[in-house]
Amino acid sequence: MATCFLLRSFWAARPALPPPGRFRPEPAGTPRRSYASGPGGLHADLLRGDSFVGGRWLPAPATFPVYDPASGAKLGTVADCGVPEARAAVRAAYDAFNSWKGVSVKERSLLLRKWYDLMIQNKDDLAKIITAESGKPLKEAQGEILYSALFLEWFSEEARRIYGDIIYTSAKDKRGLVLKQPVGVAAIITPWNFPSAMITRKVGAALAAGCTVVVKPAEDTPYSALALAQLANQAGIPAGVYNVIPCSRNKAKEVGEVLCTDPLVSKISFTGSTATGKILLHHAANSVKRVSMELGGLAPFIVFDSANVDQAVAGAMASKFRNAGQTCVCSNRFLVQRGIHDSFVTKFAEAMKKSLRVGNGFEEGTTQGPLINEKAVEKVEKQVNDAVAKGATVVTGGKRHQSGGNFFEPTLLSNVTRDMLCITEETFGPLAPVIKFDKEEEAVAIANAAEVGLAGYFYSQDPAQIWRVAEQLEVGMVGVNEGLISSVECPFGGVKQSGLGREGSKYGIDEYLEVKYVCYGGL
């Protein structure tokens, strides 16, 4: 059953909600809120349609629609912020920074912890929002909310672990002091595939460091960012510290340019495509801003002859089909050694047929939701057709799902070659292409033959091989006999054109801190 968001106004007494699909008249001058009438219902306070700037819910001159990717139904409309709204949000964040940076680390820690507590208290509603606007299965959405909240918990603790240094210099009457100070206003630009976790992973670190933020969420999934704003406000995060400016696809370019060029912004943190990242880097270069970027991936998944096949198949399922293959670290290229190839392909196909169920994310038992939009479906379809035309074999799947719309069958291809689009381009969909290889050196060469290097996976029971391959793979993160590698305690990021900097872990907060050296003389 599809969930439907309806924008409406609330009277002080809050009358009973109308039936799904119907609107009540809106009293003039009241703030816009949203509600959803879906499985279990949703708490109305979490569903907002306005921007959140300077601690206030503000409309924009225009709105844009948000759609349920599973049904195509309109969920509601959200403020379509443009250049004036973006500049106002930056100014609000800048004004708030002057006081927020002076708040004690203990108080910042307590506020982040309170925000975490509120996320946990509202985890079910937050998960339903994710499923409604992104399409991912509710169970996965629930997992994302817990993962998302953990970043707030983690950085609430890291706020109290921002340490400096005292250095004894070569001069007897001098000492060097090293201080860490917040960089300033951070512009946070996030993707649709993890609409909550990608915000808290960045914002948690920024606020813990003493920075203020302006968040521009993806146009497909703005409700999650606005729900987080509501909870941040309830937690007591001061006005202007956390700002959200949703905008449509048509205005994304101009808003992004403002965030990258405004002199009041000191830091850019972006998760998205490599192509968009390059554009933002170009804009940020003119004012030499601090930049963190988590960009595209083309993750190799290597299975060596020594691997435990069942374990490798389980890892492949976890790595490839989470969020229907729409994750930046999901396996894009499967490289399987000749001696184990046929067994792996057979068991992988069996696991896919047995375990994967395509459907609406709210339906019990669904493991594969829709792709985010028609363009995403067309990309997967194009890659499958290209591979088949060049000689690949469809083992299972291979076409749009019978449900129609944005659904695509989980697909396994064999007899794949390196010249196929599914090997050279990131898929971001439920497509698993398998290449057969003979030698370790060959697999490593294929894996490293990419301009990007975010994550990589391999399965082996040979200790010497494990050390060699882990060191040789040109990626920022490696999964050894493991298909799920993300953890709040560990650094997340890539090499080559997969990005700059690291998020999460003890290293994540450093992305929002400047190191200042003070020479103390005359001692």
From Swiss-Prot:
The modification N6-succinyllysine is found at residues 114, 123, 172, 253, 347, 390. NAD(+) binds at residues 201, 216-219, 272-277. Substrate binds at residues 201, 322, 486. Its main location: mitochondrion. The modification N6-acetyllysine is found at residues 74, 114, 128, 253, 347, 353, 399. PANTHER family: SUCCINATE-SEMIALDEHYDE DEHYDROGENASE, MITOCHONDRIAL. This is Succinate-semialdehyde dehydrogenase, mitochondrial. It comes from Mus musculus.
